[in-house]
C-alpha cells in the first residue's frame, strides 16, 4: 500500500510538470473572437504560440505525425501551421492529391496531439475557384474539430483590399456552410502589412474572423507596429500567422533586439504568434540544418540560431 501511494505521488508530480501544450485543447476548447481578442471556451483571452512548417512542396519530409508530436513535446507548441503551396512546382495546382495528403497528415496529427492547427492556403494570388473547392473539402472533413483554423490567403502581394475582401467573403461563405464556428484568418494587402487599411473597411456580419499580420524583425520595425496599433484601435482583431527575426527575404542576420520588441508587443496585446519555418533551406529563417531528422528528435546541433532562439521563446512563453 505504501508503494502504491508513492507511485501515485510520483505520477501526480509528473503530470504537473507536463507543458501546458499537453492539455491545450482540453483547457481552451472552442475558440471565438470578441472585439479584438481571441477567447477560449471559458471566455478567457488565449494566445497561441507555435511553428509554421515550410511550403509542403519544398519540404515535405517534415509533414508527418512525429514532427508534430515533437513540436508539441519539445518546443511546447500550442499551434502548428501547414502551408500548402499552390503555384510553385509540385504545388496544389500541379498535384492536388499529394498537397491535400501532406496537409491532412499535419492536421490529423495536431488533432491527435490536442493542439491547434492552421490550414494555410499558401498563395500570393487570388485563385477563387481552386480555393473554394479546397476549403469546402477541408470544412467538411474538419468542421467539427475545435483544433482547426483556416487561413484563406497567405500573403496577398499586389491585390487591393477590396479585391482581397471580396475573395475572402466568398471563401468564408464556403467554409461557414459546413463549419459555423472555427476561427478564420483573413489576409491583407502588401504581404499582410496593410492591416490598417483593412481596419478602415472590415468584413462585416461574420463571426470569429482574425486578420493576419506578418513581420520579419530585421525589416519590419516600429512603423509596422504603428500600423498594427492603428488597426487595433479601430477594432480589428489580429493574428501573427508568420514571423521571424531576420530580413523579409528570409535571410540575413537576426535582429534579436527588434524580434524581442515584436514578441513583447504581441504578448502585451494578447496576439497569437507563429514563427517561420520548419525547413532546412540554406537561409536564416529555416530553423533546421539538413542534418535534422525528418521526424523530430532534433539535437541542438541540428538547429540554426533562429531555431535555438525560437525554441527558447516558445518554451518560455508556453510554460504557463
Q: Language-model segments: what does each one mean?
A:
Residues 52, 86-88, 121-123, 154-156, ...:
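Short, histidine-centered active-site or binding-site loop motifs used for metal coordination
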Residues 1-2, 42, 101, 308:
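Generic cytosolic/nucleocytoplasmic N-terminal low-complexity/intrinsically disordered segments
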Residues 42, 46-68, 84-97, 248-251, ...:
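Acidic/histidine-rich helix-loop elements
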Residues 3-4, 17, 50, 82, ...:
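Hydrophobic alpha-helical segments, especially transmembrane helices
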Residues 1-23:
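Bacterial Sec-dependent N-terminal signal peptides
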Residues 28-31, 55, 60, 78, ...:
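Extracellular glycoside hydrolase catalytic/binding regions
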Residues 21-79:
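N-terminal carbohydrate-binding accessory modules
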Residues 64-137, 176-178, 258-269:
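Aromatic-lined substrate-binding rim segments of carbohydrate-active enzymes
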